[in-house]
């Protein structure tokens, strides 16, 4: 009998029971991989086959039984909904503040105003989060490629039963698409619409459907999809009005296709007159003005955006292998050069800020070689506490050489959350990264409260997005929220 999508809820409950048993025998990672392999067979899979594979994994796990219980979860950590509803207050991550991040970091805020609140607290959030399992919470913190979701090395250009079943087991927070996934407008609309439907069926929440649409050399959609023109490089925009109109146009065509998140604009400041075409120039004040206008345009269109790459990679040096990036700027130098564009963007109101992988030794003594995306001195002390940003903090893509050359797959999500990030973008191996976070929560390395803080921000942002885009008529981009 073919796998019936109507039985997915029963399947998930059964697999969670199997997961608990497998975890107790120290074989959780194999169970996770086997259950995904079975479910992603789509229409070829059978419910009986699904159960047999899971039971077989438990039997194998029993052979590797660990009598000392090393790595086994406590009974109170079983994969079940939380017993009480968490607070919906978007409190900052609890970390040890770096002494060298001076309180003067907030001085520049006055020039641009305090960060505007983009996502309002929604009364539904607490109950939604309380009803999630630990795995569902962790899944919501990942934005990954469509290939990572279904576990294939082949390019994905459609969303059918395989995607549906994969999202039922791993209801990720979002999907990011490359130009290889996008063939033409009707294909994109169908793929994104189907994915939103499957996400709602799985967890009752919409997906963040993301692209890197900066314009010019980094345009996933513009210039690639028939009928949509490339808007040109950021460096070609010299007036605030041009920047606003251009990025409002970008937001409009992305929303029309079904996307709801543009990982743009670039808020970095070039360090020479020969500006990178991805930036708005080398003058911090001009860049701040144009970034602010770009955010205003994206906000006017209704699409979510994410200025990047905090605290600014315009003046970094790169090691001999072309991997690790380092900024030797002091905090005072950042205040006058790289931070103003981000402050200007936050004053407009942005749902996301992306943190780069540069190290900042002059700002974070003791862990100066740590990438900013894993560094609480940058993420929590500077961005969250000193600059006052309370929206979602997303890592830059974690499948880059700067990360994969120094960190294992099961570390990256844990380190990002410990630093204060909320959303984990494109780890090299989604399964390993996700299981690393789940294990960290089970062991207490990441507290349930810390996990809930990020999940609450994600859910609040999705509910706000759904309200705004539904009212504007962008139904695919908005997705649905289970009532």
Model regions and ranges:
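Short acidic, glycine-rich surface-loop motifs adjacent to enzyme active sites
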Residues: 108, 164-185, 263, 268-272, ...
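Second-shell loop/turn segments in exported
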Residues: 110-116, 125-128, 148-154, 174-184, ...
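Second-shell residues forming the walls of enzyme active-site clefts
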Residues: 133, 154, 186-197, 286-450, ...
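Glycine-rich, aromatic-flanked loop segments that form ligand/cofactor-binding clefts
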Residues: 195-226, 246-266, 287-312
